């Protein structure tokens, strides 16, 4: 089992890497109006996931942490939604990468949801 501080740093890096990976993935989308709108929303939600996790880690109270981690879960879920829309509308040929991003999104949601429920107690 890793120490709390190590876990926090690991998740900061993981959410940031996920944001970078999604941003780079957006370049592979078909060049059309739908992909422009979806990319914009996806980049906003994935970068917000990483940024709000960093903010949660600097929270000054349990209440502030809970508030920020709720935003993280919400934004991570929105990220998954936009990735699913890309999949359903076939806006990319990069299906292996899309599948990997969907799996990572789900893992991040599960981890952050657990942190949220643990901090509520």
Q: Predicted regions span which residues?
A:
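Short, C-terminally biased terminal segments at protein or domain edges
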Residues: 1-52, 59-121
């Amino acid at each position: 089992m890793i120490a709390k501080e190590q876990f926090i740093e690991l998740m900061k890096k993981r959410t940031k890497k996920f944001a970078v990976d999604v941003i780079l993935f957006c370049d592979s989308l078909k060049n059309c109006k739908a992909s422009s709108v979806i990319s914009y929303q996806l980049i906003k939600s994935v970068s917000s996931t990483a940024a709000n996790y960093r903010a949660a880690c600097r929270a000054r109270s349990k209440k502030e942490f809970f508030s920020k981690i709720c935003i993280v879960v919400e934004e991570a879920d929105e990220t998954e939604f936009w990735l699913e829309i890309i999949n359903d509308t076939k806006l990319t040929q990069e299906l292996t990468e899309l599948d990997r991003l969907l799996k990572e999104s789900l893992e991040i949601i599960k981890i952050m949801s657990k942190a949220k429920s643990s901090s509520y107690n």
